[in-house]
């Protein structure tokens, strides 16, 4: 027997919402999904009239749905935003080169200007070359650090007021779990924040999809027939996040509300005053936001350029010893060369 839509619109239900368990027709699901995102935006005051907003676009389901919904809500509710797409090309053959074609399709479909920045032009390296140097054990560290700074660089170049990212509820719950498991109180403090950054020298980042389930984002993209790139990064299987994701999926089978439960728990966490909070400033080398001197991106880049790819991995003191050792070896070689030339 057909199930009727719970909203009593008279239509037949075609799906069951993972977030609420409600049986809905397509149109009522669209309305509920979009209304929840609008509520998140308006209740958190994510945007102001007349702002220029960069949508971090990867071509995946999250950023594609984010671009689609922001354009729709901007017109429906008169946000008065100027929306642009900002995409980062990490230089991953067979992955990013293909996904950028989807981003270009998004540009045409949503009539938004698109800016693409590459690791090659920003840092002189691609992820393919970095992985060839470092191997697959720490590649996500390099990519994550460089990507975060690349978005800041792109946002500054475009002169935007904020960056909207496609982080969804599952992503945030995974991050809470990761930071708990690692004992990373600094990141645990801010990982559930819907807005981060925005200080004197930083461009804020906002998460309009913070309370949107990944499964519902996939459903929305499917029923709306949105074009998105679904292939996983070829280097992603080795990421630590994958273990947190698998753990979260197991918990969700037992308790469907666990995603929102973890997010709410993260929001309510309080830390003792004695817990040290890292001070954020600007890097003495590149001038971008950092909680250390020099910033992580500059340290990692120095390691690559010195032929010491593991320089920025692990404790700072270890990296300093690696630099000192290399400098000493270079000095000895130079001295030996000078002595040889004297004869």
Swiss-Prot record:
The keyword Membrane does not apply. Pfam families: ATP_bind_3, TtuA_LIM_N, zn-ribbon_14. GO terms for biological process: protein urmylation; tRNA thio-modification; tRNA wobble position uridine thiolation; tRNA wobble uridine modification. GO terms for cellular component: cytosol; cytosolic tRNA wobble base thiouridylase complex; mitochondrion. CDD domains: CTU1-like. Keywords: Cytoplasm, RNA-binding, Transferase, tRNA processing, tRNA-binding. GO terms for molecular function: nucleotidyltransferase activity; tRNA binding. The keyword DNA damage does not apply. It is found in: Cytoplasm. NCBIfam families: TIGR00269 family protein. Plays a central role in 2-thiolation of mcm(5)S(2)U at tRNA wobble positions of tRNA(Lys), tRNA(Glu) and tRNA(Gln). Directly binds tRNAs and probably acts by catalyzing adenylation of tRNAs, an intermediate required for 2-thiolation. It is unclear whether it acts as a sulfurtransferase that transfers sulfur from thiocarboxylated URM1 onto the uridine of tRNAs at wobble position. This is Cytoplasmic tRNA 2-thiolation protein 1. It comes from Drosophila yakuba.
């Amino acid at each position: 027997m057909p199930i009727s839509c719970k909203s009593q619109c008279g239509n037949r239900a075609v799906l069951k919402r993972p977030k609420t368990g409600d049986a809905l027709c397509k149109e009522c699901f669209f309305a509920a999904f979009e209304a929840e995102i609008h509520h998140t935006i308006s209740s958190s005051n994510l945007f102001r009239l007349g702002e220029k907003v960069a949508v971090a676009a990867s071509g995946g389901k999250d950023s594609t749905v984010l671009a689609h919904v922001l354009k729709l809500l901007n017109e429906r509710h008169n946000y008065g935003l100027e929306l642009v797409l900002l995409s980062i090309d990490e230089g991953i053959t067979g992955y990013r080169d293909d996904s950028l074609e989807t981003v270009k399709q998004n540009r045409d479909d949503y009539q938004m200007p698109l800016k693409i920045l590459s690791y090659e032009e920003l840092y002189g390296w691609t992820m393919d070359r970095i992985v060839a140097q470092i191997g697959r054990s720490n590649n996500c560290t390099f990519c994550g650090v460089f990507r975060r700074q690349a978005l800041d660089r792109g946002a500054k170049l475009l002169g935007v007021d904020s960056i909207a990212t496609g982080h969804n509820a599952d992503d945030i719950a995974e991050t809470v779990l990761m930071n708990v498991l690692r004992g990373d109180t600094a990141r645990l403090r801010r990982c559930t924040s819907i807005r981060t950054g925005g200080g004197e020298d930083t461009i804020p980042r906002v998460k309009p999809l913070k309370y949107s389930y990944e499964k519902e984002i996939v459903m929305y993209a499917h029923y709306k027939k949105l074009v998105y790139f679904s292939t996983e990064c070829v280097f992603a299987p080795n990421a630590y996040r994958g273990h947190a994701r698998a753990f979260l999926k197991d918990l969700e089978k037992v308790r469907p509300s666990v995603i929102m439960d973890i997010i709410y728990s993260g929001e309510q966490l309080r830390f003792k005053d004695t817990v040290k909070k890292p001070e954020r400033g600007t890097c003495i080398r590149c001038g971008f936001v950092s909680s250390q001197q020099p910033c992580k991106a500059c340290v990692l880049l120095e390691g690559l350029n010195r032929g010491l790819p593991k320089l920025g991995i692990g404790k700072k003191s270890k990296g300093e010893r690696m630099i000192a050792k290399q400098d000493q070896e270079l000095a000895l070689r130079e001295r030996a060369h000078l002595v040889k030339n004297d004869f």
